[in-house]
Amino acid sequence: MKISKGTMDVLKNYSEINQSIVIKEGNEIKTISALKNILSRAVVKENFPKDFAIYDLPTFIGFHSTMSEPDFEFNDVSMTMKDGDGKGKYFYAEPSLVVTPPEKPIEMPESDIKFELKNDVLEDIMKKANVLKLADIGLKSCPKSQGLYLYATNKNNDTSNDYSVKVGDGATKKFNIVFKKDNLKIIPSDYDVTIANGISHFKNKDTNVELEYWISLEANSDYGE
């Protein structure tokens, strides 16, 4: 069995959310951060033949990157990677050592705060936030103009530099949603985003990839209720 580049990209992204992972039998991969404020689910091309855990996912990804197109064999306590004349063995971890997502899927509450997040817009905001050393990414409405704006700032600093870009129209109620920039660990793509009390849902718009994230919002978010 080979693991595709797309699946390795998912695992690389997941290693930024949690450095350990339990992969279940089948074609669905899920992860959750140690603080349980970021959760993600992906449906991949491969059907994994058994459950197994990886404790140090960055090391596993690095080991895989040293090979060209390895073939995987999943054994009882380890996996074997064959690459030409070379062969490597990587032992599974004890699953109980890994923080794992809940088995039951998250059901998002009803919400009228929805917008499309383009990848180039998010990249632009994140670049500006990094240059200006801004820790927070927000989504705010302007009922007067009915505009919806994504912005970067430091919420705890009244004299913070900031940057904003319009991402939608039709906002009829006032709200101001706040994320920690470091929590927006998503694979570059376009997303449909839904916001509800305390949580957000990012669903990938690429029909070739089933990928979604649930990310907690900051306590100082104002939902305009």
Describe the residue ranges of each PLM region:
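Long, charge-dense
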Residues: 97-113
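DNA polymerase processivity clamps
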Residues: 1-92, 111-225
